[in-house]
Amino acid sequence: SMLSPSLEDYLEEIYRFHTGLGFARVTDISHKLNVSMPSVTKAMRKLRSLDYITYQRYGHIGLTDKGIETGKFLVRRNHILQEFLVMLRAN
């Protein structure tokens, strides 16, 4: 199923925290994306129902295999877009 741009942002951040720290927490995501805790919690419920993350209410947010694959793709896509924009500016 296709993720909304908003859920993609959440998943990409979770993936970045995951590769850095090994986990993410709702507070981390809230600060990083500058969104309220209830908004993050709502998004986490959605991502969990779509089988991208494992989520314990007061615990850490983990990634499923599907979440890791998608997160990796989103980060890579972002890098490609950034390089493309740099190329456009150079011309």
Question: Residue spans of the language-model regions?
Answer:
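N-terminal helix-turn-helix DNA-binding core of bacterial DNA-binding proteins
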Residues: L3-V35
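Key DNA-contact positions within bacterial/archaeal DNA-binding proteins
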Residues: P38
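Basic, amphipathic "hinge/linker" alpha-helix immediately C-terminal to the N-terminal HTH DNA-binding motif
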Residues: G59-R77
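Short, hydrophobic-biased segments on the C-terminal half of alpha helices
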Residues: M44-R45
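Alpha-helical residues within the helix-turn-helix
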Residues: H31, R48-S49
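Amphipathic alpha-helical dimerization/coiled-coil segments
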Residues: H79-N91
